[in-house]
Amino acid sequence: MVTGASRGIGAATARLLAERGAAVAVNYHTDKDAAETLVAAIEAAGGRALALQADVTDAARAADLVARAERELGPVDILVANAIGVGARAGRPSPLLRTAPEDALAVVDAQLRAFLHPVRLVVPGMVERGRGTVVAVGASLSRRSPEGFGTLSMAKSALDAAVRTLAREVGPAGVRVNLVAPGLILSELATHIPEPVRAANAARTAVRRNGTPEDVAHTVAFLASEEASYLTGGYLLVDGGTAML
């Protein structure tokens, strides 16, 4: 199951996991056409997928999502928690001193709900079966806080902490929990970022380019695979080397 999978990182991840043999529940919130187009492409390539609408920040709707997914596709063995729950506005710069506390709290709350609701529904089954993996999609700014992104940084920091805690709690049962932390990724959510800013960011990376959804998807797929069986509680940067410069 990939939450927030109709576009960007979520869509690229769902497509790649399907290519590698997974039956994928493609969760979307509002973009039904994009989700169904993705499912059609997966099926045309010989894969198996199902588009399922749900706002995963809502407990009842998340429960319905998981029930439908498991009824149609079987138990969830891989959960990719990609949905942030607040849309593109969370990624728009706003100085922290000009941010109303209730607005900041709303972003943090939505991020944690988008992670915790699916986790609470599928991880107990993983624990019972003695296997399973959760990969959360965070952001590099959870540990590097650029100007104007304090609210999103706080939300992703909370997600980072939740991942580490859950990894410790369910590790003895054979369930792994990791987080990928992308830098600037040129997905649909980055369309509001001016070209000069994109160019400047690319110049700050060691590889001199911005990231793509596929860059993140390959990291997620690795963490979800048996090749990463000894990796849990991990925080994997996918930022082109920006953090080391």
Regions found by a protein language model. Give the residues of each.
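Conserved glycine-rich cofactor-binding loop
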Residues: 6-8
